[in-house]
Amino acid sequence: MKPVIVVHGGAGKIVEELDATYRAGVKRAVLKGYDVLSQGGSALTAVEEAVIVLEDEQIFNAGHGSVLNEKGDIEMDAIIMDGKNLDSGAVSAIRNIANPIKLARLVMEKTDHMLLTCEGATLFAKAQGIPEVPNESLVTERSRKRWMKNLKENSNPVADQIGLGTVGAVAIDCEGNVACATSTGGLTNKMVGRVGDTACIGSGGYADNNVGAVSTTGHGESIMKVILARLILHHMEQGKSPEEAADAGLNYMKSRVGGIGGVIIVNSSGDWTAKFSTNQMSWAAVKDDQLHIGIYHGENNVTPLEKAL
């Protein structure tokens, strides 16, 4: 099996002046993940490493750069799933952690549970030697300005959420194992304690070697209502291609609950897609030594991998 990896930097509306920054970010992430796969590493490690890159990039709403809740603080969610045995680990409403996806994997591998939240997740992180960082160190000037703007009367936090999507990755390795990983800072100016789709298995992501892997982005409550990631895999189980399944899932979410978003998918044969119902979604993929990058509908810029390194 030839390895494949796809990453996304969130669905929404990307302003033109940040176009190149988003492209550079997803490119770095997908190349990091593919480097793991090309050396015989697992899909699980590949998606984790790719998402760590995205969490460290200030432009994305995950890790460093996460949006602020109504109190001006950061609370983050993340999930990772292994398609080989359906094991999954997730964390929600966590603070003071630079890379939530690392903690999510530890939940999967070091506990009998699948999701730890808030204080419990913090205690677990300490026990595992994950260093705490001041939440303020994760706050960017961009996030702070957006938070302050939405404190004003007649503000519209929902509209201001545009371009602040979740980040994620899906991959299949040389042994045919698939995995997904998703991480987010959530909704800007959200209520304290709000947890969205990302940390919820089947919504923020799902991976099953028998079918494939999905990572989602978009309006979290809408994604949760239709259990988007698992819904898409169900369509694939019924014989749809990744592209057909993505369209079916996104169209259903829009028609049924009025939600928009985006998905990245890889199936058990290594076929992949990146689809979205928002204006834009930054994404990148590597397959057959070809780097693919896009932001706009119908865009797929292809570069030989040797020229992209």
UniProtKB/Swiss-Prot annotation:
Its EC number is 3.4.19.5, 3.5.1.1. Substrate binds at R194, V195, G196, D197, T217, G218, H219, G220. GO terms for biological process: asparagine catabolic process via L-aspartate; proteolysis. GO terms for molecular function: asparaginase activity; beta-aspartyl-peptidase activity. Keywords: Autocatalytic cleavage, Cytoplasm, Hydrolase, Protease. It catalyses: L-asparagine + H2O = L-aspartate + NH4(+); Cleavage of a beta-linked Asp residue from the N-terminus of a polypeptide. Cleaved into an alpha and beta chain by autocatalysis; this activates the enzyme. The N-terminal residue of the beta subunit is responsible for the nucleophile hydrolase activity. Pfam families: Asparaginase_2. It comes from the Eukaryota. SUPFAM superfamilies: N-terminal nucleophile aminohydrolases (Ntn hydrolases). The keyword Ubl conjugation does not apply. The active site is at T166 (nucleophile). It is found in: Cytoplasm. Its main location: cytoplasm. InterPro entries: ASRGL1_meta, Ntn_hydrolases_N, Peptidase_T2. One of its GO terms (cellular component) is photoreceptor inner segment. Heterodimer of an alpha and beta chain produced by autocleavage. Has both L-asparaginase and beta-aspartyl peptidase activity. Does not have aspartylglucosaminidase activity and is inactive toward GlcNAc-L-Asn. Likewise, has no activity toward glutamine. Belongs to the Ntn-hydrolase family. This is Isoaspartyl peptidase/L-asparaginase. The lineage of its organism: Eukaryota, Metazoa, Chordata, Craniata, Vertebrata. The gene is asrgl1.
